[in-house]
Amino acid sequence: GFSNKGKKLGLDDSRNFLFREFLEFVECLEPEVFVIENVRGILTTSNGWFRDQIIHKINDLGYYVNYGILNSRDFGVPQSRERAFFICSKSKMMRLPKETTSKHRTVRDAIEDLAYLNSGEGDEISNYVTEPLSSYQRYMRKDSKHLFNHKASNHKQIAIEKLKMIPPEKGKEYLPKDMLGKQLFKSTWGRLKWDEPSPTIDTRFDAASNGTNNHPFLHRAITPREAARLQSFDDRFIFLGAKVHIRKQIGNAVPPLLAKAIADQISKEYLVIEEE
């Protein structure tokens, strides 16, 4: 639909009209407040036609609406993930939350304490191998007694051989041209950088060729638990189902720490209304 990946079909893509179905539920349920999240392209695709249609429909339903782009890294999430948000209320125009931190958490902060697995290693349930090495890791562990979903993809040998050619924190520029394949995006075969937030976690984070979602130095893509940490799901979240469903649960989610910041902002706005 609106994503930077794949074709941008705009008005010719039926997925871009799913907002109408969502707003039909709003019309039926009449919540006091609701939030819409989507990729930032929803604001600009087809010269802003979809953005304007969404706002017009929300207003017609009797809601105030404020919208803008928020980056998860500004809210304590160790990931640079920009998304468009529409915050809608029957009572007043809601402000978007302000950033909660100017010091961005990093990949190292998020996953350095997790077992260093090779391709195909790990289990759905395992034990921690070290004490937490950062405040974020302590926060992630909460009171979890075990580690769940820390199981590495079993890559084909050709993928492992390619990753062995890529130095720590580097990318496909180190691969011979005859091994690049058909991937067009610059980020394919990329490794995460320890001391930076990760790029956006998507629903194919366990594929070595997908993007910059390979371990900083190990020859594999990140595990579901590592991806969950980078999304700010704490270790008590257990992801169930087939691999494809687990990837979608993690990669399609609004990071919990960002969701909390939005919820806190809405709560503050309603406290002001009650005081008035």
Question: Language-model segments: what does each one mean?
Answer:
Residues 135-276:
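C-terminal target-recognition/interaction regions appended to catalytic cores
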Residues 1, 5, 25, 233-236, ...:
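Generic N-terminal helix/loop capping motif
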